A protein has these predicted regions:
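Short acidic/glycine-rich loops and adjacent helix/strand connectors
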Residues: 1-134
């Protein structure tokens, strides 16, 4: 199973293609750090606008780097919460558009739960002994 994963919860626009939940075929990140540093922190409106500018190109590059065409994907995963609402809306709406255009299923992903699940990318058994607070 191959998924396109889209992340836009704060100040980085990211897209990756992941195979079988473990193998990263691509991972493209557009950072906004240089833009926000002059303000001393992330400015939500600027972050949202920069996501809107970057998301299409980041996604195109992730698909190209993976060698997997859009029509060969099995689904689209997207961060829906928590995060900056405007930034999240850019990613969610872009993913929804792709889902509607292609007929691919859309999988909403909770950002904090994905940090926990990231253990499955590096540990064969999922790092069965890790703690988290629910």
């Amino acid at each position: 199973m191959k998924l396109l994963a889209i992340e836009s919860s704060c100040d980085e626009t990211a897209a990756a293609v992941v195979e079988d939940g473990r193998k990263m075929l691509s991972n493209i990140i557009a950072s906004q750090v240089k833009e926000h540093v002059r303000f001393g922190g992330v400015v939500p409106e600027i972050a949202s606008r920069m996501h809107a500018e970057a998301i299409s190109g980041v996604t195109r590059r992730a698909l190209a780097q993976s060698g997997v065409p859009l029509e060969a994907l099995d689904g689209i995963a997207v961060t829906y919460a928590p995060g900056l609402i405007g930034a999240l809306l850019v990613g969610v709406n872009f993913a929804k558009g792709l889902s509607l255009a292609t007929g691919l299923p859309l999988v909403p992903v909770h950002h904090l739960r994905s940090h926990i699940a990231a253990n499955y990318l590096t540990h064969k058994n999922g790092g069965s002994k890790f703690s988290c607070v629910r």
